[in-house]
Design a protein with these regions (language model features):
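RNA-binding accessory domains that recognize and position tRNA/RNA substrates
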Residues: 1-179
Length: 179
């Protein structure tokens, strides 16, 4: 597993240092939140309700069953702005997995940091609520340091995840419309 120094910087001042399995070349902005599920990271990351959020998973190891095809996803891509895990398995052991969590994030241009104390991060979020955050390479501290955190509440997230045209999911005897 490759180790590129990376960090999560919270608007409240805390900095959590870890590593990325791939090079992070820019700053990624989002709202730091946590998820306590033991399984279902593909469903969580593709869930449109996580759009613009940097998701910290509290379960100790993530990625152990890899990523399956899109049929099990909540949408057609990763919606989260970033992924934070304590320990990352890069060699998934599941018959139906098509790739690792790390390769999926890299292909999707979504930053992934491992080696962070997600319990400590969860306590900060629990005590202060969801907080604006930046993911960046640790060696990029002196360059391009943007102190302008993004307020996710000022973005029209619903418009970004909604379909703009009707979508036919399946044909059949009855016509069902979802609005």
């Amino acid at each position: 597993l490759l180790k590129y120094p990376a960090q999560l910087r919270l608007q409240s001042g805390e900095v959590f240092s870890g590593f990325s399995p791939f090079k992070i070349n820019k700053q990624y902005f989002g709202e730091a939140v946590f998820n306590t599920g033991m399984v279902g990271y593909t469903e969580t990351l593709t869930d449109p309700s996580y759009l613009g959020q940097i998701v910290s998973f509290t379960y100790p190891i993530m990625g152990n069953y890899g990523v399956t095809d899109k049929s099990t996803w909540e949408s057609d891509k990763i919606q989260a702005a970033g992924v934070i895990v304590s320990s990352l398995c890069n060699d998934p052991k599941r018959e139906f997995s098509s790739k690792s969590l790390a390769s999926w994030c890299e292909e999707s241009n979504v930053p992934l940091i491992y080696g962070i104390d997600t319990r400590a991060l969860t306590k900060v979020i629990r005590d202060n609520g969801a907080v604006s955050a930046i993911i960046e390479a640790s060696d990029n501290l002196g360059n391009n340091k943007n102190k302008n955190f993004i307020d996710i509440n000022q973005q029209d997230l619903v418009k970004q995840v909604c379909v703009s045209e009707p979508k036919i999911v399946k044909t059949g005897k009855y016509k069902i419309i979802v609005v």
